[in-house]
Regions:
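PEST-like low-complexity, intrinsically disordered acidic/proline/serine-rich tracts
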Residues: 2, 25-240
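Bacterial N-terminal signal peptides that target proteins for export
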Residues: 2-14
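Bacterial N-terminal signal peptides
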Residues: 13-22
Length: 240
């Protein structure tokens, strides 16, 4: 059994160690803001697209070529008749890029040195865009729904390039097609304190006769939050 004196010495040693640890914490400098990127314009926040959910607010479409023009004509006819078109999202598959840029759900933009991250409520999609040149060269044989994105800053504008997008995705809910040669260029800038602007240029030499550009705006929603999105809980569509 330990003696009272020995127990007191043990307690005093623990107290001394605790005081020393607290002193060490006090001497540790406070960390800076978690998402600070002082070198660039702050684009961070929770945003919601405005101007409707067509790819272009004025409902214009790229000048389509050959089979892509015929495919869109067929889909447009079905759409105008209220018939469900062949859309991957009907089976809870991702909308893909650039359709993701116009879905009616909010996204959070997180900006850190060397990286910008887009957290979408829709389908719980995450886009990680390196801006420090650290991205490995994309493999053209590995196409995905949202492609490979890499970015850089031009003054107060974030420029994001995306390629290697699956060719069975569509530009918007009306079914505008594209090929595997699609290249998406986004130019994000803060128009004012509550508005984010994204000028989008699509280049696709197989499907479009010329590049197509449109501008989308997003409204800041500081009191909103990203909600859970589970498509599989309500996987129903008229065509099913």
């Amino acid at each position: 059994m330990s003696s009272p004196m020995r127990s007191r010495r043990h307690l005093l040693a623990l107290l001394a160690a605790s005081i020393g640890l607290q002193a060490g914490w006090a001497a540790t400098p406070a960390l800076g803001p978690l998402y600070a990127d002082p070198a660039h314009t702050d684009l961070s926040g929770l945003w919601l697209v405005t101007g409707g959910f067509y790819f272009a607010p004025d409902r214009s479409v790229p000048k389509l070529l050959g089979e892509y023009k015929a495919t869109y004509a067929r889909r447009t006819e079905a759409f105008n008749k209220g018939v469900a078109i062949d859309d991957l999202t009907a089976d809870c598959l991702p909308a893909g890029m650039p359709h993701l840029l116009t879905v009616p759900y909010p996204f959070e933009l997180m900006q850190t040195p060397g990286r910008v991250t887009f957290l979408y409520e829709y389908d719980s999609v995450v886009r990680r865009v390196a801006t420090d040149g650290s991205v490995v060269k994309p493999d053209p044989d590995k196409v995905t729904y949202h492609g490979d994105s890499f970015g850089h800053w031009e003054g107060d504008t974030l420029v994001v390039e995306t390629l290697n997008v699956r060719d069975d995705t569509q530009l918007d809910f009306t079914g505008i097609p594209h090929s595997d040669a699609l290249r998406i260029t986004e130019r994000w800038r803060r128009k004012d304190a509550k508005t984010l602007e994204n000028t989008i240029t699509l280049t696709d030499p197989k499907a479009f006769s010329e590049p197509f550009t449109t501008t989308r705006t997003y409204q800041l929603k500081p009191k909103w939050k990203i909600s859970e999105y589970v498509c599989e809980e309500n996987n129903r569509n008229a065509r099913d």
